[in-house]
Amino acid sequence: MKNDVISPEFDENGRPLRRIRSFVRRQGRLTKGQEHALENYWPVMGVEFSEDMLDFPALFGREAPVTLEIGFGMGASLVAMAKDRPEQDFLGIEVHSPGVGACLASAHEEGLSNLRVMCHDAVEVLHKMIPDNSLRMVQLFFPDPWHKARHNKRRIVQVPFAELVKSKLQLGGVFHMATDWEPYAEHMLEVMSSIDGYKNLSESNDYVPRPASRPVTKFEQRGHRLGHGVWDLMFERVK
């Protein structure tokens, strides 16, 4: 796995572009198990960043619906979903290598062949590597809420990002978000409702109950312990 996880973008003259990141790089120390997984399982399940569009049938060796998960943390819920839905393919993106190592170790232990992972900035991956109209679902669970008002612009869910996601979804594909921070849920709802071509799948036109397909994550468990609610939003691409 390459170490240049986050690559700068450049303009047409080769000058680097400054873009606000939605995450802070917290590399962390790899455990021996995570290091072993990165060394041994990355060559099979890892996908290096490039500026070439992915060919999903070639990547997975078959034609199947593809779900992209952005920011999978340690990968527990992503591995659980891939295990429960062997007829579907999953691509996970995470910027922190300990999480990637943990996910690879779990996926190997479960013997999964329908999961691939990347260690890179998801926005760059969407721009450079994900073909338009190719995804059945995009999942964004418990992204950093950037609580302070002056940091709200760092939240990943903004209009340009949601438009980018829509372009990568197939017609009928779904963008599924979840957060345990109510102001961020309200922000997500405002952003998504402002974009033409998305349909809110909530009967009350706001939030949906947690789908059975989404495993309860450690972040959700933490939220429950702290007395927080959890808000799921699901928006379908309709045009």
Swiss-Prot record:
Pathway participation: tRNA modification; N(7)-methylguanine-tRNA biosynthesis
Annotated residues for binding of S-adenosyl-L-methionine: 69, 94, 121, 144
Stored Pfam families: Methyltransf_4
Effect of mutating residue 26 to A: Reduces catalytic activity over 10-fold
Enzyme class: transferase
Active-site annotation: 144
Residue span of region Interaction with RNA: 150-155
GO biological process, one term: RNA (guanine-N7)-methylation
Binding site for substrate: 148, 180, 217-220
Family: Belongs to the class I-like SAM-binding methyltransferase superfamily. TrmB family.
Subunit structure of this chain's protein: Monomer.
Protein name listed in UniProt: tRNA (guanine-N(7)-)-methyltransferase
UniProt gene name: trmB
